[in-house]
């Protein structure tokens, strides 16, 4: 079980000691004050606390929180501190308390208990320690006025109770130097100068342990003590003899005194261990063996350094202990070390491994100082104590069970005194552990010698005489083994000892823990088997062969049994089985009465191997089919028996119907899920085919746009080359820096436009690849749909078969019901009763004739005795039947029975069957037939014949005892089997529920995956439609452009036009007019543009670039939106992003184009004559109409989708 570590905080009584020192004489205060100041051994500093409590009654008075208060008469002027505690007298201002213990009622807070099923007072946090504004919850809050007995009974005594039951216990004292750690553990009994000594926790524990042992004289025990000291990483044995066996309290106290006297003066840790080993015989005659250890650790002072609180202790062992606690409580640190807790870094943590995170129930007693000058140290220790409470130990019982080992009670009674109780070696004649160990060692030596002799024979290095001696030795050894094995088998068959089974859950846990050693012994075997991967297959094949042969042998023996067995005996057995009222048995009692499996110990549960065997048998034996025609003949049984049999058949027929309905529901759910998936796949295929058709239909548009982009790219590349040549000329001729910058800007702009055109060309040429991918995806979807259709056809066929089978079962059940109704009618019952009476009359006549014939046979006195015994047995059987019917009626009425009544019901069943067997045997003796036992005696094996011979030699009392034991074992086995069947039914229900949930979730996941694929295909279709419209629009705008940017840029600066055309590419008529001076299209030459004019030119170029490449930015944004949608966003978010981007871009393009047209018109009216306006005026209306038309088409397509 998992139990948290408990923490008890004890406040050091500084104030009480000072009052005690003032009340002493002039010679004593020096010694005591020196002990208080030194603090090397805290037992000296607290040695006078009990005496102070006795001499000064004012000290023993406590407030409601359990804190000691000063006598009001001593000094009426006292100043309370910030926590409300009395700060003491004015003469001792340094004795002000800043630590307060606040006990809390655990039941009032509803806190959980530290022990499973324990008292609420033993809760995890039953007190608070208040240090200034800080409050720390602890398991036990002990005020400064607490005595040693109070500390022991409140904190340590529950651990000792568990220790006596076989659990490990650990008590650790922790705290600042000189605060009473050693005094809490060992008291001051080791100081001979003190007249009034006080015992510590260790002494009180030892007294309680021996007191408990004296109350159980039937147990043998052994107590060993050890005392070690850890100083600087070295372990020193204070006793000098290791673990020492002690027989009484005085011996333990003596060795404890020796160890305390041998301690060093340096700061060190001490560890006192007490081991208790117990053995006794249980009521069933089985050996109980338990071993538990109690450790008492006195750690040295913390003496923290560094940033306080908390700081870190100076001692390396304590520092590593705090690191271990942090690792156990912090999952991050535990993950960092991969679960390898650093216990082995220091000697202290290695020895305390079981105490912190191990298998012992641990109590940490923290001794703190209440003074303000020790406040940082106190806070650091309290933080460590709070972490310790979060650590949980896995406490288990240390029990050892010896199977098939009977312990004989010693003839001499064990005295109740402590001194007379001896060690385990004095356990009596039943203790043969030493003999067993010697026998095992002898066997190992013989085995080793045999191997050595075999090697010598093979080596051919010995003479013939030596070889003959070795062979003779091997022959004698083989004969000895055969004799021992036969004797051991005979001894085990004679004793018929029960099998040991664990009765308590704690024993189960302890056996699981103690099974580590045998598992470690078998590691070599496991390693050898791991090198043979085919071993499991061979074992499985052999098991199958064994099952087949066993089934064939059983069928053969059954047929032989039926052929040899008399028919009358078979009919009598059938009548006996039918005589028991089956309708009064509950649903949970459908267990075969005649079934026999191997017996187990009385009162014990089934082991794991037995559970596995029963599960396998249950899975391999399906319920027999119910034949509606197999109705009990009314002439062979009474009418009531026929009705009961028909009712039983109808109840048995209900079980397969329910199972079949359950399978049918699962199958229908699978079929519905696959049908939905098939519809989704078909819809996805249709959408993909639509996309392919649209891509094929718009392939001409894409190819036309691709050609346009290619031509435009060629023009831009030529213009870029020209611009680079002009830039080179300008650099060679050393022209003005502004001109060089202008050409550099032009080249950069052309390169960017070339990159954009390459991207658009690539987008326009992707239609072929997309068609291929879509066609491949359609093929995969069709293949998936075909697979689903095949599975659907199979499942539909299986559903039809199951429905037909279910209809047959329902018909058989209806037939059974009609049979019950027909037999339940009064007329039918009357006819059956007459037929039965006629049958009974006929049988009585036959029985009388048989009786007359039997009376003529010899031995009438013996036959009469047997008949008298049979009549007595029948009377007993009637009484048992009456009691069983009473229990069945109570079960039917109350729906539940007590454990005792359930066991009584099973005992009645078994007793009735046993009486029937005895009656049958006696009838066979009367009639002169040979029993089955005698007829098959010759065919028995030799070992079985020997067993029967030994059983025949048993006396009547021994045979009665043996039969009673096996009768009890059979009852226990039937009870365990019934419980196992109930557990199996519950597990099957849970399994069915989880299978149904798993099926529903898997169908939902597959459905969601298919829906997501269909949504992605729909989005792709929308994207392709919009992309086609964009490419068509851009191709039209590109074809409407008549000139390029490079021709305008390459024109001389002196003839640059002062105005711009209505579109970005309508500059051809300007440059053409520049070559004919007769046309008045060009104004007077202007000087080179200045920096401000060049900036305006750049701004204008940037605005003009938005007109043609806005659609390309739409495509780029859509690509990014589609990537984001595929990585985690939903389809709706991607669609919204595309539509918003398209709308915004269209609006921006319209605004830019309209503004440019207006400006061009205004400037053209100023610069040109009216006859030239018609030739220079562009056609913006067509472009605008095309754009509006495309926008309407996109919106209509979005609404249709």
Curated annotation (Swiss-Prot):
One of its GO terms (biological process) is microtubule-based movement. Residues 28-56 have a biased composition (Basic and acidic residues). PROSITE patterns: KINESIN_MOTOR_2. The lineage of its organism: Eukaryota, Metazoa, Ecdysozoa, Arthropoda, Hexapoda. GO terms for cellular component: cilium; cytoplasm; cytosol; Hedgehog signaling complex; kinesin complex; microtubule; microtubule associated complex. The keyword Repressor applies. Residues 510-521 have a biased composition (Low complexity). Residues 57-75 have a biased composition (Polar residues). Regulates cubitus interruptus (ci) processing by recruiting multiple kinases to promote its efficient phosphorylation. Scaffolds multiple kinases and ci into proximity to promote its hyperphosphorylation, which then targets it for SCFSlimb/proteasome-mediated processing to generate its repressor form. Hh signaling inhibits ci phosphorylation by interfering with the cos-ci-kinases complex formation. Negatively regulates hh-signaling pathways during various processes, including photoreceptor differentiation. It is found in: Cytoplasm, Cytoskeleton. Keywords: ATP-binding, Coiled coil, Cytoplasm, Cytoskeleton, Microtubule, Motor protein, Nucleotide-binding, Phosphoprotein, Repressor, Ubl conjugation. The modification Phosphoserine is found at residues 599, 605. Pfam families: Kinesin. This is Kinesin-like protein costa. Residues 4-391 form the Kinesin motor domain. Residues 23-92, 502-536, 565-606, 618-639 are annotated as: Disordered. Residues 652-821, 968-1001 form a coiled coil. Disruption phenotype: RNAi-mediated knockdown results in the increased expression of reactive oxygen species (ROS) in the gut of 7 day old conventionally reared adult flies. No increased ROS expression in germ-free adults and in response to bacteria-derived uracil. Homodimer (Potential). Binds microtubules. Interacts with ci, smo, sgg, CkIalpha and protein kinase A catalytic subunit. Interacts (via kinesin motor domain) with Ubr3. GO terms for molecular function: ATP binding; ATP hydrolysis activity; cytoskeletal motor activity; microtubule binding; microtubule motor activity; molecular sequestering activity; protein kinase binding; RNA polymerase II-specific DNA-binding transcription factor binding. The gene is cos. Polyubiquitinated by Ubr3, which leads to proteasomal degradation.
């Amino acid at each position: 079980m998992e139990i948290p570590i408990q923490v008890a905080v004890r406040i050091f009584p500084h104030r009480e000691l000072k009052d005690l020192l003032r009340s002493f004489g002039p010679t004593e205060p020096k010694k005591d004050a020196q002990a208080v100041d030194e603090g090397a051994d805290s037992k000296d500093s607290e040695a006078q606390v009990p005496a102070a409590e006795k001499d000064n009654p004012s000290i023993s008075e406590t407030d409601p929180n359990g804190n000691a208060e000063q006598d009001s008469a001593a000094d009426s002027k006292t100043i309370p501190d910030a926590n409300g505690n009395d700060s003491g007298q004015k003469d001792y201002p340094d004795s002000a308390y800043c630590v307060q213990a606040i006990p809390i009622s655990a039941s009032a807070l509803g806190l959980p208990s530290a022990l499973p099923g324990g008292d609420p007072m033993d809760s995890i946090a039953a007190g608070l320690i208040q240090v200034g504004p800080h409050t720390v919850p602890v398991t036990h809050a002990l005020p400064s006025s607490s005595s040693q007995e109070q500390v022991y009974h409140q904190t340590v005594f529950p651990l000792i109770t568990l220790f006596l039951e076989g659990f490990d216990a650990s008590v650790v004292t922790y705290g600042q130097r000189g605060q009473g750690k050693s005094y809490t553990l060992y008291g001051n009994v080791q100081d001979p100068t003190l007249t009034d000594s006080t015992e510590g926790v260790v002494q009180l524990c030892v007294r309680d342990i021996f007191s408990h042992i004296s109350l159980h004289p039937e147990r043998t025990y052994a107590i060993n003590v050890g005392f070690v000291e850890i100083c600087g990483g070295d372990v020193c044995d204070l006793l000098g003899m290791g673990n020492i066996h002690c027989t009484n309290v005085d011996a333990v106290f003596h060795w404890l005194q020796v160890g305390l006297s041998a301690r060093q003066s340096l700061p060190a840790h001490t560890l006192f261990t007490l081991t208790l080993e117990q053995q006794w015989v249980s009521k069933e005659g089985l050996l109980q063996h338990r071993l538990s250890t109690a450790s008492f650790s006195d750690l040295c002072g913390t003496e923290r350094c560094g940033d306080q609180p908390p700081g870190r202790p100076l001692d390396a062992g304590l520092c590593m202990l705090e690191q271990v606690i942090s690792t156990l409580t912090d999952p991050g640190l535990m993950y960092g070390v991969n679960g390898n807790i650093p216990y082995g870094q220091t000697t202290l943590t290695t020895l305390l491994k079981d105490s912190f995170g191990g298998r012992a129930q641990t109590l940490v007693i923290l001794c703190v100082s209440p003074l303000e000058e020790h406040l940082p140290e106190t806070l650091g220790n309290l933080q460590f104590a709070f972490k310790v409470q979060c650590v949980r130990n896995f406490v288990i019982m240390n029990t050892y069970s010896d199977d098939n080992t009977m312990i004989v009670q010693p003839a001499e009674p064990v005295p109740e005194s402590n001194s007379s109780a001896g060690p385990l070696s004095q356990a009596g004649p039943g203790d043969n552990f030493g003999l067993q160990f010697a026998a095992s060692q002898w066997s190992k030596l013989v085995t080793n010698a045999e191997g050595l002799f075999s090697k010598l024979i093979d080596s051919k290095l010995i003479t013939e005489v030596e070889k003959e001696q070795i062979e003779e030795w091997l022959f004698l050894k083989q004969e000895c083994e055969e004799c021992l094995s036969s004797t051991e088998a005979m001894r085990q068959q004679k004793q018929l000892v029960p099998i040991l089974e664990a009765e308590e859950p704690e024993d189960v846990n302890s056996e699981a823990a103690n099974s580590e050693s045998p598992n470690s012994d078998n590691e070599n075997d496991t390693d050898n088997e791991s090198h043979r991967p085919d071993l499991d297959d061979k074992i499985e094949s052999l098991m199958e062969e064994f099952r087949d042969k066993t089934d064939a042998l059983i069928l053969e023996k059954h047929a032989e049994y039926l052929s040899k067995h008399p028919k009358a005996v078979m009919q009598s057995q059938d009548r006996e089985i039918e005589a028991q009222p089956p309708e009064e048995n509950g649903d949970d009692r459908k267990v075969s009465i005649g079934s026999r499996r191997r017996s187990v110990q009385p009162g014990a549960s089934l082991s794991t191997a037995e559970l596995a065997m029963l599960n396998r048998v249950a899975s391999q034996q399906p319920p027999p089919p119910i034949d509606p025609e197999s109705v009990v003949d009314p002439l062979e049984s009474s009418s009531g028996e026929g009705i009961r049999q028909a009712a039983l058949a109808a109840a048995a027929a209900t079980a397969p119907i329910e199972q079949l309905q359950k399978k049918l529901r699962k199958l229908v759910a699978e079929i519905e899920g696959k049908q939905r998936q098939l519809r989704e796949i078909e819809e996805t295929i249709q959408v993909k085919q639509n996309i392919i058709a649209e891509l094929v239909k718009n392939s001409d548009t894409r190819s036309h746009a691709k050609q346009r982009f290619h031509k435009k790219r060629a023009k831009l590349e030529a213009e870029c080359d020209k611009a680079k040549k002009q830039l080179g000329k300008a650099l060679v001729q050393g022209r003005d820096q502004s001109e060089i910058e202008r050409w550099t800007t032009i080249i950069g702009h052309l390169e960017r436009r070339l990159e954009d055109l390459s991207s658009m060309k690539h987008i326009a040429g992707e239609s072929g690849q997309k068609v291929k991918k879509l066609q491949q995806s359609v093929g995969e979807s069709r293949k998936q749909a075909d697979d689903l259709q095949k599975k659907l056809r199979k499942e539909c066929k299986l559903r039809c078969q199951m429905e037909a089978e279910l209809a047959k079962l329902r018909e058989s059940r209806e037939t059974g019901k009609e049979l019950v109704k027909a037999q339940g009618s009064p007329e039918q019952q009357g006819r059956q009763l007459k037929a039965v009476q006629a049958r009974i009359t006929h049988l009585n006549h036959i029985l009388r004739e048989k009786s007359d014939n039997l009376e003529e046979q010899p031995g009438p006195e013996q036959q009469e005795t047997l008949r008298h015994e049979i009549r007595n047995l029948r009377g007993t059987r009637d009484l048992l039947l009456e009691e069983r019917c009473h229990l069945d009626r109570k079960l039917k009425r109350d729906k539940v029975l007590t454990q005792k009544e359930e066991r009584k019901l099973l005992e009645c069943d078994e007793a009735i069957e046993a009486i029937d067997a005895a009656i049958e045997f006696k009838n066979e003796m009367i009639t002169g037939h040979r029993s089955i036992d005698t007829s098959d005696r010759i065919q028995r094996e030799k070992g079985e014949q020997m067993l029967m011979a030994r059983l025949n030699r048993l006396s009547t009392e021994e045979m009665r005892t043996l039969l009673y034991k096996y009768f009890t074992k059979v009852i226990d086995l039937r009870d365990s089997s019934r419980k196992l069947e109930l557990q199996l039914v519950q597990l099957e229900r849970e399994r069915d529920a989880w299978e149904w949930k798993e099926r529903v979730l898997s169908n939902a996941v597959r459905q969601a995956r298919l829906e997501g694929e269909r949504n992605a295909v729909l989005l792709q279709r929308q994207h392709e439609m919009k992309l086609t419209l964009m490419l068509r629009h851009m191709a039209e705008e590109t074809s409407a452009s008549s000139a390029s940017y490079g021709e305008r840029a390459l024109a001389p600066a002196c003839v640059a036009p002062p105005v711009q055309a209505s579109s970005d590419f309508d500059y051809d008529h300007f440059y053409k007019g520049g070559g004919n001076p007769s046309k008045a299209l060009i104004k007077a030459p202007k000087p080179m543009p200045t920096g401000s004019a060049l900036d305006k030119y750049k701004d204008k170029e940037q605005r003009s670039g938005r007109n043609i490449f806005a659609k390309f930015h739409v495509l780029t944004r859509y690509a990014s939106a589609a990537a984001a949608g595929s990585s985690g966003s939903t389809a709706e978010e991607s669609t919204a992003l595309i539509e918003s981007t398209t709308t915004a871009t269209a609006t921006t393009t319209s605004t830019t184009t309209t503004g440019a047209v207006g400006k061009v018109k205004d400037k053209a009216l100023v610069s040109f004559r009216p006859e030239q306006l018609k030739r220079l005026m562009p056609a913006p209306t067509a472009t605008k109409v095309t754009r509006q038309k495309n926008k309407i088409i996109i919106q209509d397509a979005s609404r249709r989708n």
